[in-house]
Each structure stands twice: as structure tokens, then as C-alpha cells.
Amino acid sequence: MLDLPDIGLYRTTQPLPGHEDTIPAGVLVYVGQLANGGTKFVVRPADNRRNRWFWRDPTTPLRSPSWAKSLKKLPSEGFYTLPETLEFSGGARWVKGAIVELGYNGEGRGILFVAEWREDGTENVLYFSDRGMLIEDKLLERLVWAPILPTKNTQAAANE
């Protein structure tokens, strides 16, 4: 049995042999597995909606353990809290413990989107911009998972 990585997000550090044009070094990829424990595969992102990547065919079978070992594991997209206050030029800052959404660019670099509450809004919800801040890997590795419960829009579901 091949020694291949767990399912999840990764950044390539080397091109995939035989697929250098489609899976070069320095890109975001998803390692997945076919249903029922089938073959593992690697795929580049297709679409980004609401700061999250979505994947689709074609996928590439993952058969190179040596290349797989070169992948850099990335934390899951989703919600986290900041482990420290971040200061930005112009005096802006995001405080320690702020809720942020983690996403990635196509190169597999982390992007944070800070939660905002709109004082003049009518809904009791947090908003996340579609523009975030690139972060260094050392911060990426220290983010604290925020277990925010995903739900469906009950009003939209009732109207279906």
C-alpha cells in the first residue's frame, strides 16, 4: 500500500512529475480519495465562493509517495480566532481573540477575513469581506479553531 498523505489542503513545493503544467510548485491543492476507500487523488481548485474553494474533475491519481512527502499540510478553511493582536499600517488593528475566516489564494497562502458586525444592519449576523489579509505561515500555524456551527438558511429552506 502506498504511503500517501491524509485528505486535506496542501501547498505544493515541487511540481507533480508528469503533470508539471497542471500541478506546478507553489500552488494550492486538495488531496482527496474516491468513495469506498478508492484511489487517492490531487486536484487544483476550480471556484471560490464566500472565501472557500470548491473542487471538481478532472482529478489526477496520486501515486507518488516521494512527491506526496513534499506537500506542505495546511489548516482547513473555516473559522478561527487570532492568537495575538495584529497591527497594520495606518493604525488599524485586529485584536487578539477576534473571529476570522481562513481562506487561501491559488498559491496556497493563507488569507484572513475578519468578522464584522454591522451596527446599522437588521440581521444579527457576522459578515466577512471578500477581501482579506495575506498572512505568514508562522501565524497560520497558530490560529485557534473556532467551532462555529454551520446551518442552512431556514427562511430560504422554508420557501423551497
Label each residue range with its predicted role.
Residues 2, 15, 66, 86:
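Residue-level detector of functional hotspots within protein domains
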